A protein has these predicted regions:
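Divalent cation-coordinating acidic motifs and surrounding scaffolds
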Residues: 1-194
Length: 194
């Protein structure tokens, strides 16, 4: 674990894409590992990048050898909820076009990302992976810094009975006056939403 962006970039540059082409995978094992095998610091930014070219077992994909669910018995939606409750944000990187070849995969990964406040990010070439990772980390850290600064005052006003829309409007105006900007990961949307 590190908070050094150059170290993250250097490590990512050593990775390469290989394998693939087979059906549903043990996605729940990766999610469970992020929850139980990592020693998360209490007040740190907690981001998990789940890179996938196939869906998990048990979501109704054709040819799934474990159609009733993951062989480890874990429920991926429950794991996503547990991540959210622990403050872990899940960014799912969809290796394309492989992932879109499945009927339910992109909807599934979009859903578990959303549960945790993360995003589903399409990735058409592995060469862009380092940019996706660094962009995700910078966006999350930037937003958390802003939340730490304004969150307590906003929470106090809302819990004190102030109108949420009015508080949001005032905060927006203050941030505009300060010329406050946040970093935001942007990417071309290649998935069609139903």
């Amino acid at each position: 674990m590190t908070n050094s962006v150059p170290e993250i970039q250097a490590t990512l540059k050593t990775l390469f894409a290989s394998g693939g082409g087979d059906g549903p995978e043990a996605v729940t094992a990766a999610m469970k590992s992020a929850l139980s095998d990592l020693d998360w610091r209490q007040n740190s930014s907690k981001i998990v990048l789940l890179i996938a070219d196939a869906p998990p077992h048990g979501i109704g994909e054709y040819g799934d050898g474990f159609a009733t669910g993951s062989p480890d018995g874990e429920d991926p939606l429950q794991l996503a909820r547990e991540m959210a409750s622990r403050g872990i944000t899940l960014f799912c990187v969809a290796c394309e076009p492989a992932l879109s070849g499945y009927q339910f995969a992109t909807d599934f990964f979009r859903a578990i990302s959303k549960i945790t406040g993360g995003l589903l990010i399409p990735l058409a070439t592995a060469d862009l992976l380092a940019h996706v990772v660094v962009g995700s980390v910078l966006e999350m850290m930037n937003l958390e810094s802003l939340i730490m600064e304004v969150g307590p005052a906003v929470g106090e006003r809302v819990h004190g009975g102030s109108d949420v829309d009015e508080v949001a409007r005032e905060l927006h105006e203050k941030l505009l006056l300060r010329q406050e900007e946040t970093k935001s990961l942007s990417f071309e949307r290649i998935h069609v939403r139903a």
